[in-house]
Regions:
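Structural and coupling elements of P-loop NTPases
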Residues: 1-475
Length: 475
C-alpha cells in the first residue's frame, strides 16, 4: 500500500491522537436524535438545542427527515470528550432504513443503544442487540424519557436483563455501592474471585468487561430535558476503551454518498497507518477488476459542514473525494472486506415510468443510486424490458420516490410487490445427525412436515425429558 505517514505539521487532524467513533442506535421514536442534540450541546459543539418536532436538529438536515421527524440517512458530528476526539454517528431507527444503520456498525468503537423508558424493549431493539453482538461492539444503554409518567426503573432493568443480557447493569449513582459491585462481580468469574478476595473492583476491570461485552452499563434520564446525559458521557469516558491500530495502512468503506454539488463521497474509517491526499490507493471493484486512484480531498464532516485535512490517521472517520470504484463494505490496504450484511429487503418491485421516459436511459441514471443504497439490488430484466428493485417497506418506497424525483427529475411508480424468495416443503422429510467421538454419543433426528397454508412455523419435540433435559432440547 502506498499510503504512508507524512509531515503532520500544522495539520489539525493530527492532534490530539485519541480518536473514538460512537454510534447511536434505537427503535424509532425512542429519542435518539434528541440525545445526539443534547450530547452536542453539552460538549459545546452546538450553541442552541434543536428539536425533532421543531425540525431544526443539527443532524437531521435532509428535508424528508425533517418533514417526517425520523432519521433516514446516517450522519456524523465531531466533538471532544476530555482529551478524546469523538465522531458521533447517528443512525436511522426506522426498520425500513435498518440496512443504512447496519452499514455504520462496521466502523464503530462503541455504541449507545437508546431505549424508551415509556415502551421498554421493543422488537426492533432485539434486532439491534443481535447486530451489536454480531459486530462485537461494546454497548452502553441510555434509557430515555424517564420524565414521562408511569416509567418504572426496576421493571425496565428486569426487562433489559430478561430480553437482552443479564450483563445489563444499572450504573445510577443512587443505588447501593455494595449491591452494584456484587452485580458487576457476578458478570465475570475472574472478577468474582478478585472481589471476594479484596472486596473492590477497579474502573479498569469494568472497562475490560465492557470491552468484552460482559457488562453493559445502563444510564437513565431524559434527553429532552438534558437529564442523565452528562452521567452517560462520564461513563463512556471512564469505561470505553480506545482501540489500538497497526502502522500498516488499512481502511474500511462503510458508505457511498454525494455532496450538494453531486461529487461522489467515499465514507471510510482508517483502521491502520495514515491516509493522505493525492497518494495512490489500490483496490478491486465488485467485479474483481483492479484499480488505482488518488484521493482529491479528505473531509471531516460534522453535520452538513466539513473541514478539509491533508491526512486522516488511524481511528478517524472521514469522507474522501476522487474515488470512483469503491463500495460499501470494501476493505482497502490491509483491511479485509466486510461479511455480507444480515439485514436484506424482503420485497421486490417493478419500477414504472411515464410513457415518454426512455427506460434504458432511466436505468443508467438510477444506477448510481445503488451505490448509495446497495440493498436496492437494482436489476435490468432485458426479456421483460423492466427495472426491478428490492426494498424494505412502504416508508422506504415513499422516500425513494421523493429522492428520484428531486435528484433525477423522474416520476416513478412501484408496482405491486412480491416476496423476494419464498419456498416451502411439499412432503415429509427426515434428517439424521450422528455424532460419536471418544466417550460421547449423540444422534438427532429432525422431521419436517408441511403444515396448513398460512399456519407459520411450529416446533415440537418428542424426546422424553427423562432422556434429555428440556434445556438441551430448545429449538
Amino acid at each position: 500500500m502506498e499510503n504512508t505517514s507524512g509531515n503532520r505539521k500544522n495539520n489539525p487532524a493530527a492532534k490530539p491522537e485519541k480518536y473514538i467513533n460512537i454510534g447511536l442506535l434505537a427503535h424509532v421514536d425512542a429519542g435518539k436524535t434528541t440525545l445526539a442534540e443534547a450530547i452536542l450541546y453539552l460538549q459545546g459543539s452546538i450553541r442552541k438545542l434543536g428539536r425533532v418536532d421543531h425540525r431544526d436538529t443539527f443532524l437531521d438536515t435532509d428535508a424528508m427527515e425533517r418533514a417526517r421527524g425520523i432519521t433516514i440517512f446516517s450522519k456524523q458530528a465531531r466533538l471532544t470528550l476530555g482529551d478524546w476526539q469523538v465522531t458521533l454517528l447517528d443512525t436511522p431507527g426506522h426498520v425500513d432504513f435498518s440496512a443504512e444503520m447496519e452499514r455504520t456498525l462496521q466502523v464503530l468503537d462503541c455504541a449507545v443503544l437508546v431505549i424508551s423508558g415509556a415502551d421498554g424493549v421493543q422488537s426492533h431493539v432485539e434486532t439491534l442487540w443481535r447486530l451489536l453482538r454480531r459486530y462485537e461492539i461494546p454497548t452502553f444503554l441510555f434509557i430515555n424519557k424517564m420524565d414521562q409518567p408511569g416509567t418504572d426503573r426496576e421493571a425496565l432493568m428486569a426487562g433489559l436483563k430478561a430480553r437482552l443480557d443479564d450483563g445489563c447493569v444499572d450504573f445510577g449513582e443512587d443505588r447501593s455501592r455494595e449491591a452494584w459491585l456484587e452485580e458487576l462481580a457476578m458478570c465475570d468469574e475472574e472478577l468474582m474471585e478478585q472481589y471476594l478476595e479484596d472486596g473492590g473492583i477497579e474502573a479498569e476491570d469494568i472497562s475490560r468487561l465492557t470491552a468484552e461485552r460482559k457488562v453493559f452499563p445502563c444510564y437513565f434520564g431524559s434527553a429532552l430535558k438534558n437529564e442523565g446525559v452528562d452521567k452517560l458521557l462520564e461513563g463512556i469516558r471512564r469505561y470505553a476503551r480506545l482501540p489500538e491500530y497497526p502502522e500498516t495502512f488499512g481502511a474500511k468503506v462503510y458508505k457511498i454518498g454525494r455532496d450538494a454539488q453531486g461529487a461522489r463521497l467515499t465514507y471510510l474509517k482508517v483502521t491502520g497507518g495514515c491516509l493522505q491526499v493525492k497518494k495512490p490507493l489500490k483496490g478491486k471493484s465488485r467485479e474483481g477488476e483492479p484499480w488505482e486512484e488518488k484521493t482529491d480531498q479528505i473531509r471531516l464532516y460534522s453535520g452538513t459542514g466539513f473541514q478539509m485535512v491533508q491526512e486522516a490517521r488511524a481511528g478517524m472517520v472521514c469522507a474522501v473525494t476522487g474515488l470512483t470504484k469503491t463500495y460499501s463494505g470494501q476493505g482497502l490496504g490491509a483491511e479485509p472486506a466486510s461479511e455480507l450484511p444480515v439485514l436484506e429487503p424482503v420485497l421486490t418491485y417493478r419500477l414504472s415510468f411515464p410513457a415518454d421516459v426512455d427506460i434504458h436511459r432511466a436505468y443508467r441514471m438510477l444506477r448510481p443510486l445503488e451505490e448509495e443504497i446497495p440493498e436496492l439490488h437494482m436489476l435490468w430484466d432485458a426479456s421483460a424490458n423492466e427495472i426491478r428493485v428490492q426494498v424494505m417497506g412502504e416508508v422506504q418506497i415513499e422516500i425513494l420516490q421523493n429522492l428520484i424525483r428531486e435528484r433525477f427529475e423522474l416520476g416513478v411508480g412501484f408496482d405491486a410487490g412480491s416476496i423476494v424468495y419464498k419456498e416451502t416443503i411439499a412432503d415429509t422429510v427426515e434428517g439424521v445427525g450422528h455424532f460419536e467421538p471418544l466417550r460421547h454419543y449423540a444422534e438427532v433426528h429432525l422431521l419436517l412436515e408441511p403444515g396448513e397454508p398460512g399456519s407459520g412455523l411450529q416446533f415440537d419435540t418428542i424426546c422424553s425429558e427423562d432422556v434429555l433435559d428440556r434445556d438441551w432440547q430448545r429449538l
